[in-house]
């Protein structure tokens, strides 16, 4: 582990101090905010870049949950329509996607609290032994969104039906799927949204450890 850390420190030389924001302009404010940013940064070969202009979609943060039943070796997936998957002109696949439970982190909220709340709102389940897995950037070339991924122990017998908030026009169907089946669907490309792919890969690598850890709790 010390060797790995040493290697990372040798590779990554730049920090926040090596990029300078020159200006920003709000282009649109709605469900999300769109800004135009101008910046410059240090170059690998030395010196400074020219002025770079980029549009950024400001989304903030989100939490996602690998809702896993260790006794049944099953994972809870939710299905809902996604306009981004419907809008792609070359896609002939259904825009109703199989996903992990997830939701946006509002100002003042903690990611772990959002994970627990969304589990109840989207799937009607209670989560215990919530464990932080990792946090990742979602397409940081043009989007500001940090996704916090958690794993949580659930009783899959609770998970059924259709859920979501009426005031947000949510229509979410709950599915209980064996872990190996969900992983196979991911490998076949049937589950193809980023955070679900990351989450199911993480679960495949760590499910045995979760089973042992939760058994002791």
Swiss-Prot record:
Active site (UniProt): 168
Which terms are listed as keywords in the entry?
Hydrolase, Magnesium, Metal-binding
Motif position, Nudix box: 103-124
Q: In which domain of life is the source organism classified? A: Bacteria
Could you tell me which residue ranges the Nudix hydrolase domain spans? 58-204
Residues reported to bind Mg(2+) 2: 118
Q: What class of enzyme is it?
A: hydrolase
Q: Binding residues for Mg(2+) 3, per the UniProt record? A: 118, 122, 170
Cellular component terms (Gene Ontology): cytosol
Q: Which SUPFAM superfamilies match?
A: Nudix
This protein's cofactor list reads: Mg(2+)
Coiled coil stretches, renumbered: none
**Binding sites annotated in the UniProt record for Mg(2+) 1:** 102, 122
The task this protein performs is described as: Acts on ADP-mannose and ADP-glucose as well as ADP-ribose. Prevents glycogen biosynthesis. The reaction catalyzed by this enzyme is a limiting step of the gluconeogenic process.
| NCBIfam families for the chain | nudix-type nucleoside diphosphatase, YffH/AdpP family, PRK10729.1
The protein here is known as ADP-ribose pyrophosphatase
| Species, as recorded | Haemophilus influenzae (strain ATCC 51907 / DSM 11121 / KW20 / Rd)
Please state the gene responsible for encoding this protein. nudF
């Amino acid at each position: 582990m010390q060797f790995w850390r040493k290697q990372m420190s040798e590779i990554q030389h730049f920090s926040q101090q090596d990029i300078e924001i020159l200006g920003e302009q709000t282009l649109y404010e709605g469900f999300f905010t769109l800004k135009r940013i101008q910046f410059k940064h240090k170059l690998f070969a030395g010196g400074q870049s020219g002025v770079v202009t980029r549009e950024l979609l400001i989304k903030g943060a989100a939490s996602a949950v690998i809702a896993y039943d260790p006794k049944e070796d099953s994972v809870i997936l939710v299905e809902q329509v996604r306009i981004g998957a419907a809008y792609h002109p070359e896609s002939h696949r259904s825009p109703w996607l199989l996903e992990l439970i997830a939701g946006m982190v509002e100002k003042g909220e903690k990611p772990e609290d959002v994970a627990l709340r969304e589990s109840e709102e989207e799937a009607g389940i209670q989560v215990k032994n919530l464990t932080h897995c990792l946090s990742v950037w979602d397409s940081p070339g043009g989007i500001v969104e940090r996704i916090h991924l958690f794993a949580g122990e659930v009783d899959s017998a609770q998970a059924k039906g259709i859920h979501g908030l009426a005031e947000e026009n949510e229509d979410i169907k709950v599915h209980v799927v064996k872990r190996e089946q969900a992983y196979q669907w991911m490998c076949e490309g049937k589950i193809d949204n980023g955070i679900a792919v990351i989450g199911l890969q993480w679960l495949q690598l760590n499910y045995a450890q979760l089973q042992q850890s939760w058994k002791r709790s």
